[in-house]
Swiss-Prot record:
It catalyses: tRNA(Ile) + L-isoleucine + ATP = L-isoleucyl-tRNA(Ile) + AMP + diphosphate. This is Isoleucine--tRNA ligase 1. IleRS has two distinct active sites: one for aminoacylation and one for editing. The misactivated valine is translocated from the active site to the editing site, which sterically excludes the correctly activated isoleucine. The single editing site contains two valyl binding pockets, one specific for each substrate (Val-AMP or Val-tRNA(Ile)). Coiled coil: none annotated. A motif ('KMSKS' region) lies at residues 593-597. It holds the Pfam family Anticodon_1. The gene is ileS1. InterPro entries: aa-tRNA-synth_I_CS (IPR001412), aa-tRNA-synth_Ia (IPR002300), Anticodon_Ile_BEm (IPR033708), Ile-tRNA-ligase (IPR002301), Ile-tRNA-ligase_type1 (IPR023585), Ile-tRNA_ligase (IPR050081), M/V/L/I-tRNA-synth_anticd-bd (IPR013155), Rossmann-like_a/b/a_fold (IPR014729). A motif ('HIGH' region) lies at residues 57-67. HAMAP family: Ile_tRNA_synth_type1. It comes from Bacillus cereus (strain ATCC 14579 / DSM 31 / CCUG 7414 / JCM 2152 / NBRC 15305 / NCIMB 9373 / NCTC 2599 / NRRL B-3711). One of its GO terms (molecular function) is aminoacyl-tRNA deacylase activity.
Amino acid sequence: MEYKNTLLMPKTEFPMRGNLPKREPAMQEKWAEMNIYEKVQEHTKGRPLFVLHDGPPYANGDIHMGHALNKVLKDFIVRYKSMTGFSAPYVPGWDTHGLPIEQALTNKGVKRKEMTVAEFRKLCAEYAYEQVERQREQFKRLGVRADWDNPYITLEPAYEAQQIKVFGDMAKKGYIYKGQKPVYWSPTSESALAEAEIEYQDKKSASIYVAFPVKDGKNVLEGDEKYIIWTTTPWTLPANLGISVHPELEYSIVKVNDEKYIIASELFETVAKTLEWENAEVVKTVKGSELEYTVAKHPFYDRDSLVMLGDHVTTDAGTGCVHTAPGHGEDDFVVGKKYGLEVLCPVDDKGVLTNEAPGFEGLFYDKANKPITEKLEEVGALLKLTFITHSYPHDWRTKKPIIFRATAQWFASIEAFRKELIEAVAETKWVPAWGETRLHNMVRDRGDWCISRQRAWGVPIPVFYAENGDPIITDETINHVADLFREHGSNVWFEREAKDLLPEGFTHPGSPNGEFRKETDIMDVWFDSGSSHQAVLEEREDLQRPADLYLEGSDQYRGWFNSSLSTAVAVTGKAPYKGVLSHGFVLDGEGRKMSKSIGNIVVPKKIMDQLGGDILRLWVSSVDYQSDVRISDDILKQVAEVYRKIRNTFRFLLGNLDDFKPSENAVAVAELREVDRYMLVKLNDLITKVKEAYETYDFAAVYHAIHNFCTIDLSSFYLDFAKDILYIEGANHEDRRAIQTVLYDVLVALTKLVTPILPHTADEVWPYIPGVTEESVQLTDMPEAVQLDDAEALKTKWDAFMTLRDDVLKALEVARNEKVIGKSLNASITLYPTAEMKAMLESISEDLKQLFIVSEYKLGGMMDEAPADAPKYEHTAVVVAQATGETCERCWVVSETIGKDAEHETLCERCATVVKENYVK
């Protein structure tokens, strides 16, 4: 007889190799055929809603690692929620207006000057849709489950119509106004920028100290003094109309040779050192407030420079006397407005100085620095010129420096509802908790929101102008424009004349001749995506406002989190979200930012083509995503190793359940042995721990718990000793069926627990599980932890056994290294445990030699009775010897019972019995 044919070895069709790059696309096709998204919505219908609202990625180019991290995190949450009593619809979105698309078309050779705005916008829309399609396929390849056939896209007519309504609501409440104000202005984009569209980079600038002679001392000064200002933007000096001092600071009149200068007393030493003054003496001090309304002369123009009080003046740098140009700075503007100064801005859209800067007209602002500095030197006003490198705002798209420039713009007044914004921030749950402080400070400190852009590709600002210049925004015009956009899209604004965009028969007292013109500016793209709570959450039947969660990168505190909050609070008085979760950026393996120049860019597509989507997803679950995260080939290799371990665990479980029918073979919990029940306790602990981790969005805890369970609880312990019973005993042996019952519970629970993270693998495992009826594991719920009555006692006892077992394993390892034994089944062990451990061992009814995977086990005396040369460990001394007897051909155990049964002379007594009872006819 061939004894190896009597062993019940694992049998399964489930493949050992994942081959994910090939297998996943096939699985995704299967999902598409069975309409998995709709099936899940049907399955969870009627449950309470959980809405994770997708912040729309920008529709341009392939998805990068940041996109992958973001979408996969969202998918974890949505999948988990749909398996824990919620209906969790997920509608993906795209942000599709804005400058990058205009630039992409220009780069493709589109000659926009040769076509109408409407024609150019049509090309922009076509391009945007192509990009949406491209990104949609890449997101699907990640295994993200979403309503891919019905996404929201910001350029769609229904969306634009709702955005117009949001604008109209804000205007009606008095939150929208037009004003002349310095805004971030990008000469390279020729447009105003929002705070979210700027980034800081190092820039080399001139650093100059300039003297402004006093013209009128107002009886505080004698008139022969000079104010000293410091600036790094000499090009703004033609726009200087004043000097700001702090009311509470003390100022010194300093005599240097024959000159007298005015500076803040605190800065005397620094300025004296910088300007290399020798023998400088303070002749008088005055309070800043006393200098108010004194007048200085502009250094090279025949005009006054008014001295004003401003709280923005600091002693961090400079002289305490601040050059003030209301057309070129937020603080300057505020102070200038208070003192009735005009808003002078002698720089045009392209960043070129105009004829309001005589002597420098026609120069690009940056190129004007040198001639202006030379002019200052010529008139004797330049006290010092050096160059510094400092952090300076740049256009996030063109990467070029920006300027502050006063222009006529449309604004949303944040001031008008700042209090409500701050309250809304406090009512929201922030993860990480510092998110609250971050957004609170932004909302507290931010100025009014400049919402107009001088571009073509975007949603038009729905304002008309009467003949007398009055802006027209009424319920009637807003509703009419919204209806037109819903029917024709926003391009209708550029295709029709103003009168054809107004309601029929519309009249206005400011237009006696019935003539009107329309606004040509478009809205900031942050107003587009920031209106999604109205256009998507409020409009779609399957969603609701506020959403339960917004989840984006930490750059969105100043972006989408902020703009969504502003429009939602303005329109509804409440935040659009109950909770906000943010993640960090993806860096390379060394913690560097990814960039083309370094050549360290990791692309999701490459990972999916080489390793598979589930490996990328497993990586996402493994990192501390609330901070910046790292990725590299080495890191992915480690993750792939963990995946292999999880996959092999599934394969082992399936292989050993090939002949198991849960309805016929399952053993009742009460009839299981202690060690099997202990394994169920460990499984229930895992279920509890993993579900708690999912609940708190701690996916790394899920990853580690599952990995540890597979390697430590299963592989190193339970599955290791169970093989002896699973393979050797007869099919229906009670111990074998008991272990299979546990393995079955473990398999079903484990498959469900990994589903949110490894959906392809979980759905690949699912149909192989005996007795399952659901078409997909995604149509099931998370396992429930079953509390065993004696769970605590089992845990105490068997956790103690596991620590003692560790001591035994160490001893066996030493014996192997010293060539006392070959493998552990060659061993005979005698234990000399502590009193506590001895009592525990005596209470175990299971076969201890099976649990230790040795051929012979003996319990000696107490630990202090052990032979002197026996290695002592924390809980026991262990004597390891070669087991006596011969090796059984079937089970490999060393036994003195080999050949006792004459018919099976190469088998031990146990195997001979199993063979006779099960295989001999």
